[in-house]
C-alpha cells in the first residue's frame, strides 16, 4: 500500500469520526431512550423523544 493510499484511508476515517462527534446528541423531537442522548438533557419517558430545554 502506498503512502498516498494510507493517507487517503486515514482522512476518510477521520472525516467519518467528525460526523459522529458532531452528532453526539439528539436535537429536540428526536427519538431517545435515555436523557443523556438529548442535547437538552431531557428525554420524555412516556413518548421517547427529546424535550426542549
Swiss-Prot record:
The keyword Secreted applies. Coiled coil: none annotated. Residues 1-18 form the signal peptide. Disulfide bonds join 25-39, 32-43, 38-50. The presence of a 'disulfide through disulfide knot' structurally defines this protein as a knottin. GO terms for cellular component: extracellular region. It holds the Pfam family Toxin_18. Keywords: Disulfide bond, Knottin, Secreted, Signal. It comes from Orgyia pseudotsugata multicapsid polyhedrosis virus. It is found in: Secreted. The keyword Lipoprotein does not apply. InterPro entries: Toxin_18 (IPR012623). This is Conotoxin-like peptide 1.
Amino acid at each position: 500500500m502506498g503512502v498516498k493510499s494510507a493517507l487517503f484511508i486515514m482522512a476518510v476515517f477521520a472525516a467519518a469520526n467528525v460526523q459522529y462527534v458532531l452528532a453526539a446528541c439528539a436535537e429536540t423531537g428526536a427519538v431517545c431512550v435515555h436523557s443523556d442522548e438529548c442535547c437538552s438533557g431531557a428525554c420524555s419517558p412516556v413518548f421517547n423523544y427529546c424535550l426542549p430545554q
